[in-house]
């Protein structure tokens, strides 16, 4: 048997790797090569890799204790990890070695990769950003820990039935997770409900005691996060809810089996599913439970780890920093105060001083529905002691506000954590701002916007608290891993330094003038498109032309992301092609993919519209060699890894002022796609780095939208443009759904009679004109390829490594180390 943990990757042979995999197959999977299924082989490979990781994992964690480092704790309700096998192999530097070893065993590596389920513990960009940041923190040797929830079911599996989205459970744990280790020794009680008893103890100290509670246990599961090209292996710790009582035999013995298992199920529901439907009271309560469950277990774990090597808590703020990934974990501020004041018996002022140094808050949105504001009655019932703590935080905070702005009740109201009104609410964003050392936006535009609008009065109170850290993506997954052909071309041309220092991509800009290099670049894109064509056929049974323009709009379905505007443009083009069938146009394949929240009726209707339009367009022989429309179901990280390398045009068309940053825009441009988009989020900074002339920018600016909102009349746009009117008429007349002609009338009503809140019609003409410029350029392959190269060359700033260096330097105050060993 191979002692795999002692291997040096530079000395490992294909044969020894093969023997190590076979050892795991025999001893861990208990199968022989003759009878093993592809999943068995995948599991054997994963367990082999885990053995490789174990040595670095232990060394890293022991080193953190030995050196008494300051640790970063990244709290997030979402982590969209995707698949881990290839990523781990790449970061360990043994991807080719394992591929060759499997080939000697007559197994296709790429087929085995498909055996792994996506770890879909997230909903969209928030969770994927968290995953990129974990990768970068490990690569930069930041002593960091991710903390989240081990959902039994992640984001739902999306199925398209008769054009409609239907949700099915995402059973990502059906075959187990080979990357996790259960840490049964780390089991923490989390208490809900109950009542608070205040009394003076025998020492004369005021005590707040929470009694008659419902207790849930949080069980730790650890996933290793290896850095690229170093020996650092950090941890992602996920919590699973468990009942403290187990099976109640008293119920069972009295014939009440249902009650016996129901009590357990209700408690364990906390970690059952990502984001329950919070449009109903029960869903709201479960979601608030999830958020407190995460922060309570995590803060207890942080304190345990600190006190393992420190006698008292005096230096806690010197050794601990917590980053809140949006408002979901903002309860951590109240929980830290609860532990420091109620359990550790620190004076309030000292505990608050420590807490406000430890915590930092990343804001990801200005959309009102995404800013958490919990009803007071729900909060009081579920977390009575924490409500008292928040009241005390708010009272002391408003005293400061009153001192700065005497007799100004409007200021007190707008800056209060507790919102008054018909239904009192706890404003979690305000709590996060008041309780954090730093508050950051995620693009320069978004950071300015929150200072000017959302947190304007907070910014006026303490401007030094606000900072920008523009998002980034990991070049390991989003170029080296997902686009090996492009990575190979880059390696041969400029070396592979860009994988750890993305700014090195700027070196390829000069090669845009080299016709031979452009030919190689075009060849890479065509082969990637051919691969995507095969995947499309396997997914939805449609044959598409790889020489057509691949126009991709893949992201969460939401009105502000304006998939509706895109499909209205498609209908516009379809009408034009029918009227002028002989015109010289660029054959285009429009690809949509994304999930709508289960309770978001309009978003789900937009999915139905896209599929209905696709049915009509793709079956119309007059146009289907010029225009094809596809909706690829069940969008996820692994699907994005196939779509992005084969994309020609990236749709980033949100209503200006509503997209905080976006990271899909970065991934597409990194892989040579050209961007059509508004001046919103990170598009603005991309235009600065790539060159606005190398993007297709259109639409109203955020300040223009603010002005237009007062007097906007979408009907006048239809009155002035009969072609746009014709598009809406087709929807109203039921052209795309003859079985139910009224089906899409709510969309028309939303646009014409509910004020078109996302300015779809206001930007539609400009959007159509921008697409005409796209078509003109695509007819000139050399010019298109040059700009494609410029796009990739200009993306050096948008690395998650750079973002983490910004956090480490400006917020966390911890050192980072590059793969070359250089520190800062």
From Swiss-Prot:
SUPFAM superfamilies: UDP-Glycosyltransferase/glycogen phosphorylase. GO terms for biological process: glycogen catabolic process. It comes from the Bacteria. It catalyses: [(1->4)-alpha-D-glucosyl](n) + phosphate = [(1->4)-alpha-D-glucosyl](n-1) + alpha-D-glucose 1-phosphate. PROSITE patterns: PHOSPHORYLASE. Its cofactor is pyridoxal 5'-phosphate. This is Glycogen phosphorylase. It comes from Chlamydia pneumoniae (Chlamydophila pneumoniae).
